[in-house]
Amino acid sequence: VITRSYGSGSPVTLVAHGLGATPGEARIPASGLPGTRVVVTLPSHGDAPDAPEGYWDYGRIAADLGTVLADQAVGVSLGAGALVRLLSVEPDRFARVALLLPAVLDQRHGSFTLQQLSDLTVGPPIYVAERRAALARLAAAAGQLPGQVAVPDASVLAAVSAPVLVIGAVGDPLHPEDVAKATAAAFPNGELWLIDSPAPMITHRTEVRHRLVSFFAG
């Protein structure tokens, strides 16, 4: 993986993007947070090399995220699932965690195609073009990730004492609200915010940014 740091000082926030995120999109969740934001670029994204064969496994991605020293973390979709896996093996790893649009917890879900991801992309034409170009590198991920779970048994997350904010969408077939609800419920200090939009990172970007700033401020 590649990491890039923005800002300076503490706290240090790890930022883990979703599948097919463009470089600019990957930075969005942490914009406005104080301290240092360390944005991870996973293989086959941005200027990172293509993923090695068999890479797309939540455990392997979690291990890569675990190499970044940080006080707190934000993950989106695939990144959220990898953070959940990391917390399952290191429950005291972070002081606070935000999980945006989790796609899976401990129950398997149906497959998805890159065409589905492309068709669900909305926004300005330049962004849509960048997103579709990013997805073109991810055929292996689309073949390997469906059927996987973030954790085999969500009950292990009861060992996580840190506050965890889960932000879910309503009407997003790839990020079901039931998964967001189950994820928030799995953490003793979990908090759920369901946004009535299938694409809250676009329709409610300002509100999400303000909520994250407030959450990490404690």
Spans of features found by a protein language model:
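Short beta-strand/loop motif that positions the catalytic acidic residue
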Residues: 160, 166-168
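Conserved alpha/beta-hydrolase "acid-adjacent" motif
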Residues: 173-179
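Flexible "cap/lid" loop of the alpha/beta hydrolase fold
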Residues: 81-123
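Active-site loop/oxyanion-hole signature of alpha/beta-hydrolase fold enzymes
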Residues: 39-72
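Conserved alpha/beta-hydrolase "nucleophile elbow" surrounding the catalytic nucleophile
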Residues: 17, 71, 75-80, 169
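Hydrophobic, aromatic-rich cap/lid helix
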Residues: 127-155, 171
